[in-house]
Amino acid sequence: MKALLFFLAVMLGAPAGSAQEWEAIKADGAYIWGEGWGGSVEEADRQALAALTSRISVVVTNDFRQVEEQVLSSEGDGHYLRTSHRSIVHSCLTLSNTHRTVLKKGRKAHVGRWIHRDELERIFTGRKARILEYEQAALLAEQSGRVDEALRCHYWAYVLLCSLQRPSELREPDGGMLLNRIPERLNAILEDLSVGMTGHDGDVVSLRILFRGMPARGMDFSYFDGSRWLAGPGVRDGISSIVMAPGALAETILLRVEYAYRGDSMMDAELRDMMDALDLKPLKKSFIFFRTL
């Protein structure tokens, strides 16, 4: 009966509740674990999660090919990935997919964190499915001219892809490697945007935004008004407008197309954590200059 209760506690993520049960977890090769100490349970928990991350780094290293300074476009411009193996592994761990036991509370708190090796594999398997779903949604959005949705889905797919153990192995049915294709698709969308001024009334500038020759059905952007960056009102059916600072209307205006949608990612704790862990620099092609004359 005791063994059954312990098994249920481990599977359900309930605190094991005793040092003896924690030692059993540590001795069982089916689990990867970490423990931490601190002046509070919260501090000890952070230390335990960091220790677990370090141990998983060793496990994953055996079959993980680190992607270092991977260029997002075949032309060599745009977006570089510079991140450590440790930060990528950290991105697969969240408070929701690891288990915790509080061994001691108070100013000498002691906390254990663990995950079953099979659970770790399930995390990566589920992530692969999400990547393919995002890519399918992105391609459909491209076909209908929904630039915002296409960029968001492509970029989120890429963030998830970079967190896999072997990102270069995830391919499309024709054998194409998504690690190359997603960056190319992101840059192609940005290259196929054209922005022009259709008129202005004082400091209010009317814009026309085309995507592959047709009115963009949706796009989000920010712009430099001559003194600061401001959020634009968005694009609907190829039409938008901006308000420049008084007297700041110049021959060229700079827009920055939104593609990461970090605010929306806050609804997905796992995706948000990965965005924080991966050091992805901005896509250069997301900055668009257009002439007002």
Where are these regions (language model features)?
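Hydrophobic alpha-helical segments and their boundary regions
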Residues: 2-3, 37
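Sec-dependent N-terminal signal peptides
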Residues: 3-15
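Domain-level marker for long, solvent-exposed, non-transmembrane regions
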Residues: 18-293
